[in-house]
Every structure is written in C-alpha cells, then in structure tokens.
Amino acid sequence: MKMFKKIMAVALVGVMALSMLTGCAVTNAIIEDKAETALENAWSTEKNENVNFKSGKFTSKDAYTKTKKDVVNGIIKVEEGKAKLSTYSDANYTVVVVAEPSSAKKVKNWNGLAKTVLVTANWNNGIYVNGTNSKTAKVDIVTGIKGKNATEDKDDTYTIFVFAKSETAYNNK
C-alpha cells in the first residue's frame, strides 16, 4: 500500500507539472494570435490594403537570439506603449521589442501598439510583403519574455516580433 501511495504521488506531481507547462503554452499562443490579428488590423487601417500575417519560424536566427538575451539581461528595456527596433536587425530580419500590454489576450489591447510596431519596423522597408492580390507577410511573435521594466527596477513581460524583411527570409522554412 505504501508503494502505491508513492507511485500515485509521483504521478500526480507529473500531471500537475504537465498541466502547468501546457497552460502557459496555450496562453502564449492566444496572446500571439491576438497580436497577429492586431498587426493585420493596423496594416489594413493605415495602408488601406489587407495583408495576412503568417507565422514564421525565425527564433533560431541570430537577430532574435541576441535580442532575447538582451531583454532577459535588462539591456533592452521598452516603455509601455512604445516599441524598440533591435540593433540586431539585419538584411533578412527586422526585430521589434515591446512591453506586453495588460490583458494581452484581447485584440483591442494590441491595436494601438500594433501600429507602433509596424511604424518601428518601417512598414514595407522592414517587412517583406509577398503577392499582389492576396498579400502575406511572415512574422514570428514570441510572448512572455521576462525582462526589466524601463522606468522602475522591477520585472516586466516583453514580446518580440521578428519580421521577414527579405524574400530570402520569407521563403526560409
């Protein structure tokens, strides 16, 4: 009976850990989706054309990894409502960092910030748009990155947008 209790305790700990891990992943996916929708809304409003932002997989790129490291180490800090172009952006990728808005699971809380992100990325010069009638752009949005607050010495949560800036990056699988 003692062995059964020990096994069940270990199983319970495993189940709880798994549920916590997947819960965070689901939350980040929701936030990323809302941010992506806000980018599409901002582009449509400002440029009067529809661009579908597709998810790219650019987190293995130097531009992203160096930017994330600087956010985590408190080197890059961004005030709420503003965006910062990463110095690690290069010929293929444009990297923009923002402080995550409160209630980031709602599109309306990303709307103003999405325009700021696009302006910081320099619209068409910093974001490769493919197609003529059905336009698409690729972005990798990573949320929930812990860093330091821009105005106070406390923790803050950041989101990093990595846009394909060139056709080469856009076609990169």
Each model region followed by its residue ranges:
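Gram-positive cell-envelope targeting signals
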Residues: 1-35
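Phenylalanine-focused residue identity feature
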Residues: 4, 53, 58, 161-163
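Intrinsically disordered, low-complexity segments enriched in small/polar residues
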Residues: 12, 21, 54, 79, ...
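Generic low-polarity alpha-helical segments
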Residues: 16, 63-68, 129-132, 173
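Intrinsic-disorder/low-complexity peptide segments enriched for small residues
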Residues: 16-19, 83, 111, 116
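Short, well-ordered surface patches within globular domains
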Residues: 26-93
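A well-ordered secondary-structure block
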Residues: 87-173
